[in-house]
Swiss-Prot record:
Reactions this protein catalyses: 3-phosphoshikimate + phosphoenolpyruvate = 5-O-(1-carboxyvinyl)-3-phosphoshikimate + phosphate
The protein's name in its UniProt record: 3-phosphoshikimate 1-carboxyvinyltransferase
Localization annotation: Cytoplasm
Gene: aroA
Listed GO biological process terms: amino acid biosynthetic process; aromatic amino acid family biosynthetic process; chorismate biosynthetic process
Amino acid sequence: MLESLTLQPIALVNGTVNLPGSKSVSNRALLLAALAEGTTQLNNVLDSDDIRHMLNALQALGVDFRLSADRTCCEVDGLGGKLVAEQPLSLFLGNAGTAMRPLAAVLCLGNSDIVLTGEPRMKERPIGHLVDALRQGGAQIDYLEQENYPPLRLRGGFRGGELTVDGRVSSQFLTALLMTAPLAEQDTTIRIMGDLVSKPYIDITLHLMKAFGIDVGHENYQIFHIKGGQTYRSPGTYLVEGDASSASYFLAAAAIKGGTVRVTGIGKKSVQGDTKFADVLEKMGAKVTWGDDYIECSRGELQGIDMDMNHIPDAAMTIATTALFATGPTTIRNIYNWRVKETDRLTAMATELRKVGAEVEEGEDYIRVVPPLQLTAADIGTYDDHRMAMCFSLVALSDTPVTILDPKCTAKTFPDYFEQFARLSQLA
């Protein structure tokens, strides 16, 4: 039996949430700190499953680090160059794409013999486009089970050079190549085929590389130029900003049933594209205020929206459940990459929205949601996907309870999400 959590109807949400650190920023920063010259003090690191998988891998690769008792501060002694394994090594990375993709690239520098594997779902998440690009740069990589999917066996050999990578499936493939290229022997030019999805996530990568002393030139996100033979240098300390995708649930809750909710740790200077989620809520009718270190949202009369959300794929899921409380239909477009995330999020979202009474049209790369007059109480399947669990908590902002199956799946990015959500909520 799966555990479940029933949320009773909520009359009002109000208060402040200090956001946990960003998953995307935490795992990039940990890896760059490990590769850098010098010791880096990382503050506000996320403590979650995906981060633990990265830390376990770095430890197995001989990286020394010290974690604070609450695991949110990490002091990393950089190796000042590539990560190597003296003996053949197997690394288990769970379902952490932010660990699997960058490590698959970085560990192709040098000539170690390393296997990367993970949970069954990780073996269904495509990695072929990244492997193709790494092979163009000389990497020796074997698929151990299914072609184009993990587990992978890496035997080094990556030297840089002229690479092309498909940009349409995941921006993490490009992130992995960008973080690896400065340490390669040769200069690297990366050309993007097709439209690059989730561009703002590339901005996070470039921002972090710059913080660790490396500048990357690019031509409109289509061609990237990286000098080889460089070394990352520790910035000394680095503050991980709050997780903007995690902020989306609290901001949406305020838009639906505020009161006013303030999330801290992100703001108008944030490097994460998912902060643009607040602009979408504003377009729908919520009231939004931005500070340097906070975003605040208050209730408004919400209207349905029709919008391309390729730039905020994770936070866009929150719009799909917010749509239940808007007047008129909502269409979220250009989100094909929902299909290759923790689960096939398009099908999962459509299935569960129908359970609570919505009329849903699921396209190849879009979803259209027509809200019901009255929401239906339902048991929500979460598909081992943290974001499904968090998105559907918003159903309780109606006069109907909702039951979330396997609520602990939020441990991937936000272990105490439901406690934080309850803290803001006044029950009907």
